[in-house]
Amino acid sequence: MGRGRVELKRIENKINRQVTFSKRRNGLLKKAYELSVLCDAEVALIIFSSRGKLYEFGSAGTTKTLERYQRVCYTPQDNNMECETQSWYQEVSKLKAKYESLQRTQRHLLGEDLGPLSVKELQNLEKQLEGALAQARQRKTQMMIEQMEDLRRKERQLGDLNKQLKLKLEAEGQSLKAIQGSWNPSTATAGNSSFPVHPSQSNPMDCEPEPILQIGYHHYVPAEGPSVSKSMAGESNFIQGWVL
């Protein structure tokens, strides 16, 4: 009669757990030895009991197998880091060379360090300068045209604003004239005859003097000669006439 299937869970009985550990440990160590002998494999087995006791097996030595394991696991990562470092170094070298080339080209464009250049290189440099000059002139012309268009647009806006202000001023002038006409006496007399208005004199000095009534008073100023008697006679006649 065969044994039943063992349920995989922690054995609660301490004695049974220790017995099972001893049996399974010995069997595992035996299987590791058989695998190394039968298959010519390098096998390393490390076991720690629940009490911390170490059990190990190594066909070529546990330490040697662990060192080999570390080399296999960590060497590819080191190789990747080395490859990445090499790639960055090459990239930095390319950027440095490009930077130096740009600096050299800038000096040539400024007319510096032209001695080492050949005739062909000088011709290419001349073409580059001519092209750059043409582009600069074209850009300058374009900017001037844009500025002129902007000034024309502002001029049109100011002209329209001036026209609007002129029309507004004319309208206000017409309104002011209408108000002045409504308050003009001649216009008011012509418009409404039921309310006669006497025209005012523009200059008070132009008005004729009103007659002065003299009652019982005469300012006499004595004078010499015959004019005195004549004047007195005239004044006497004036008084007598008024009394009568």
Curated annotation (Swiss-Prot):
Task: Please tell me whether the keyword Transcription is annotated for this protein.
Answer: yes
List, for all copies, the residue spans of the domain called MADS-box: 1-61
- Tissues/organs with expression: Expressed in flowers and seeds.
**Which Gene Ontology biological process is one annotated for this entry?**
flower development
Q: What's a Gene Ontology MF term here?
A: protein dimerization activity
Which coarse location class describes where this protein primarily resides? nucleus
Keyword terms = DNA-binding, Flowering, Nucleus, Transcription, Transcription regulation
Q: Could you tell me which residues belong to the region Disordered?
A: 180-206
Q: What does this protein do?
A: Probable transcription factor involved in flower development.
Could you identify this protein by its name? Answer: Agamous-like MADS-box protein MADS3
Q: Where does this protein come from, organism-wise?
A: Vitis vinifera (Grape)
Q: Which gene encodes it?
A: MADS3
